[in-house]
Amino acid sequence: PFQPFNRSPQIRYRYTSGKGLQLTGAVLWQLQYLSAGPNGKSEEYIKNSCIPEVYVSADYKVDGLIAGVGMEVLSLKPRQQTTVDDRVYKVNERVTSLSFEAYAKYMTQDWVIAGKTLLASNLTQACMLGGYAVTSVDPRTGEQEYTPYRHSMTWLNIVYGKKWKPGIFVGYAKNLGTSDELVSDQLYGTGTNLDKLITAGAELTYNVPHWKFGVEYTLSSAWYGKLDKS
């Protein structure tokens, strides 16, 4: 869970300056890859929100080097009604999150060096760790307020060679918790009880036109923790 992965219907605009600068903006809707919430992973949360996911980025390309930064905004409505003491209440709940990334890739005839670091917030729709939790509950209506989980993810991949290509991969993910104090044990997301994760791998591939053969070994270690509301 170090690299966001998602396929979604979207409208995308890209501007290229001709001097290596590239600007990208996109609005996305959820279809196959979905956010987590009270009813598991579902498209209903973004449908209730009526606001698409937004992504913007800026890339710079020169002499085999690509470097860039990006930002993502996601706003969901987990629920539209609650039931308290056999009474049904209409509620207006929303959780909004911001995620940021910085990345670079350097390529020569023999080397490929790539890396990325993310400050990720509620990116469960992108196959990442994350989610959100409850910060307050209205005792009369059951309406809840939420705060997103924040995670730091960083990875580095280095590959050398032309026909025979040895390579290494290292990744580190850390649960940074939430910005607000929690009032409930109820969590919505993926891997919210994971404190940190470390992955290291090595590979060797043999490359010829139209074919690639290889072996890879990966070791992953995960540390888990208990919920601390304060």
Regions found by a protein language model. Give the residues of each.
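Surface-exposed coil loops of outer-membrane beta-barrel proteins
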Residues: P1-D59, L129-Q144
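Detector for outer-membrane/organellar transmembrane beta-barrel domains
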Residues: K61-L194
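Residues on the lipid-exposed face of transmembrane beta-strands in outer-membrane beta-barrel proteins
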Residues: I11-Y15, V56-Y60, A102-Y106, G115, ...
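Transmembrane beta-strand segments that form the barrel wall of outer-membrane beta-barrel proteins
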Residues: L23-W29, V69-S75, I168-A173, G214-S221
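Transmembrane beta-barrel outer-membrane domains
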Residues: F2-N6, K47-E53, V91-S97, E145-H151, ...
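Short active-site-adjacent structural elements
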Residues: Y33-S35, L176-S179, S221-K226
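Short loop/turn motifs that connect adjacent beta-strands in outer-membrane beta-barrel proteins
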Residues: Y13-T24, Y60-A67, M107-D110, K163-K165, ...
